[in-house]
């Protein structure tokens, strides 16, 4: 397959380099387009009306393109550069840190994959625990081999797969669980501070407020020790409310 590879951790991130190596070993043609620097939390943001520059990055057998933009910018530029031979698949990751629950709303990793499905291309986001329980290469090997087992005919256009590895060794996981997105996630603490000149500023830091997840969701199963697969879609229409409002009179 021709695969467009991206992330939000940046072109030099170990997760991107590791899965690149594994995909190439399996015979795939891999084209990395990733941010010049880390852009975690960028979500679906795009750089409007500002120059986006690209730089070829060579490191041993690795060849990729660094872009001074967001993860979504990287996918857009990548698709433009590959327009004569479009990718069969877009992979975002492997991210350092889980993207489950409401984290998904802020995730540049998931947003990059979602940009792929907006373009009508099958897309997957991979995330591992922030603390490396296993070497990054182990997650990459598992992720690359998992691709062979995914039946993309079961994933309609306009949807992606969001895959997360739990905070235990891959060998100790309970298996793979397909599950729904939780409404839990990171919370953000705001701290008011002052710089060296006494000028006040705000600092946002994330923390996890839960010790267990809402039953049968990605957070729950991840904490239980499962590898989670959650299908997501960019059509955010609330169908039940839509139907109810259609029956409502606004006159």
Curated annotation (Swiss-Prot):
Record's catalysed reaction(s): a ribonucleoside 5'-phosphate + H2O = a ribonucleoside + phosphate
Molecular function in Gene Ontology: 5'-nucleotidase activity; metal ion binding; nucleotide binding
Catalytic activity, EC: 3.1.3.5
Top-level taxon: Bacteria
Positions that bind a divalent metal cation: 8-9, 40, 95
Cofactor(s) essential for the protein: a divalent metal cation
Keyword terms, alphabetized: Cytoplasm, Hydrolase, Metal-binding, Nucleotide-binding
Free-text cofactor note: Binds 1 divalent metal cation per subunit.
Hydrolase in keyword set: yes
Annotated localization: Cytoplasm
GO CC terms of this entry: cytoplasm
NCBIfam families registered for this protein in UniProt: surE (TIGR00087)
Function of the molecule: Nucleotidase that shows phosphatase activity on nucleoside 5'-monophosphates.
Protein name: 5'-nucleotidase SurE
Gene it is expressed from: surE
């Amino acid at each position: 397959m021709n695969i467009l590879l991206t992330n939000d951790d940046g072109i030099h991130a170990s997760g991107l380099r590791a899965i690149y190596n594994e995909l190439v070993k399996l015979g795939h043609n891999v084209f990395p387009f990733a941010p010049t620097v880390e852009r975690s939390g960028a979500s679906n943001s795009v750089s409007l009306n500002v120059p986006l520059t690209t730089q070829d990055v060579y490191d041993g057998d690795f060849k990729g393109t660094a872009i001074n933009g967001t993860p979504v910018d990287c996918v857009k530029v990548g698709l433009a550069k590959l327009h004569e031979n479009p990718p069969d698949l877009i992979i975002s990751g492997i991210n350092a840190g889980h993207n489950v629950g409401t984290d998904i709303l802020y995730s540049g990793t998931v947003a990059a994959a979602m940009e792929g499905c907006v373009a009508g291309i099958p897309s997957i986001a991979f995330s591992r625990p922030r603390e490396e329980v296993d070497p990054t290469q182990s997650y990459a090997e598992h992720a690359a081999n998992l691709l062979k087992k995914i039946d993309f005919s079961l994933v309609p256009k306009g949807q992606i797969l969001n895959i997360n590895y739990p905070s235990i060794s891959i060998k100790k996981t309970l298996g793979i669980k397909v599950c729904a997105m939780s409404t839990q996630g990171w919370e953000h603490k705001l701290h008011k501070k002052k710089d060296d000149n006494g000028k006040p500023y705000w600092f946002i830091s994330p923390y996890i407020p839960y010790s267990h997840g809402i039953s049968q969701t990605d957070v729950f199963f991840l904490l239980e020790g499962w590898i989670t697969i959650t299908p997501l879609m960019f059509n955010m229409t609330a169908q039940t409310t839509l139907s109810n409002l259609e029956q409502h009179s606004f006159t």
